[in-house]
């Protein structure tokens, strides 16, 4: 239950805003996005029923555009990122993005009226990296801190990491990825991610038949 709460709350904070992202401060962006996705879930009966295709479409359209996956992949890969070729880096980012689609889609299926409470933003004008702090609250459960690490890019503010209870979401993959690289190399990691993503796509396709 605790993992479902934390992951679902991550999704709830990242839907598409009603105005261009670059016009909003980072905290206003995340707050606006959370309201947008809540409204989408509440009016879409297919999402509420757990329709995989509809949920994946919501994730693709409203959540993923607000992530810097290259930055997230660099954190997850650690020192191994420097060893990867440009082509391998591109493949890693693509497969990691697909992996997170699955994570967020699963979280949306388990949404149960969690609430986000935002903290005042501590940042200076001109800062290119900021932390948007919040807490996830649910009846009968302990509040969980959730901090969004964001950076300003030419296309607006992007999330590159989320810290849940102080633990980096991107860094949670680091040990697994490092072990895979030790055992099978970077190509082995890419193949492993690709295989898992294909298996998930096949399962989702069978559900939609």
Model-derived regions, located:
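Surface-exposed, polar/charged faces of alpha-helical domains
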Residues: 24, 43-46, 50-54, 83-87, ...
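Low-complexity, intrinsically disordered terminal/linker segments enriched in charged
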Residues: 161-209
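Surface-exposed, charged secondary-structure patches
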Residues: 102-144, 196-209
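Early exported N-terminus immediately downstream of N-terminal targeting peptides
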Residues: 23-104
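Bacterial N-terminal signal peptides that target proteins for export
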Residues: 1-8
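N-terminal signal peptide c-region/cleavage motif recognized by signal peptidases
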Residues: 15-18
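Short beta-strand edge/turn micro-motifs at domain boundaries
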Residues: 143-171
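Short leucine-rich amphipathic alpha-helices used at interfaces
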Residues: 47, 53-54, 59-61, 65-67, ...
């Amino acid at each position: 239950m605790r993992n479902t709460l934390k992951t679902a709350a991550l999704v709830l904070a990242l839907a598409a805003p009603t105005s261009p992202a670059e016009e909003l401060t980072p905290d206003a962006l995340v707050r606006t996005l959370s309201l947008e996705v809540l409204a989408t879930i509440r009016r879409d009966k297919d999402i509420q029923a757990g329709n995989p295709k509809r949920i994946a479409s919501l994730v693709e359209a409203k959540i993923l555009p607000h992530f810097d996956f290259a930055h997230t992949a660099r954190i997850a890969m650690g020192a191994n990122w420097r060893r990867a070729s440009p082509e391998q880096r591109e493949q890693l980012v693509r497969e990691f993005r697909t992996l997170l689609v699955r994570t967020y889609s699963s979280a949306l299926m388990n949404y149960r009226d969690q609430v986000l409470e935002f903290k005042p933003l501590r940042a200076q004008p001109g800062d290119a990296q900021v932390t948007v702090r919040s807490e996830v609250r649910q009846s009968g459960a302990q509040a969980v801190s959730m901090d969004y690490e964001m950076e300003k890019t030419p296309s607006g503010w992007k999330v590159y990491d989320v810290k849940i209870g102080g633990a980096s979401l991107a860094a949670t993959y680091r040990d697994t990825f490092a072990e895979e690289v030790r055992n099978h190399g970077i190509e082995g990691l890419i193949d492993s991610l690709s295989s898992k993503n294909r298996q998930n796509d096949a399962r989702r396709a069978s559900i939609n038949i």
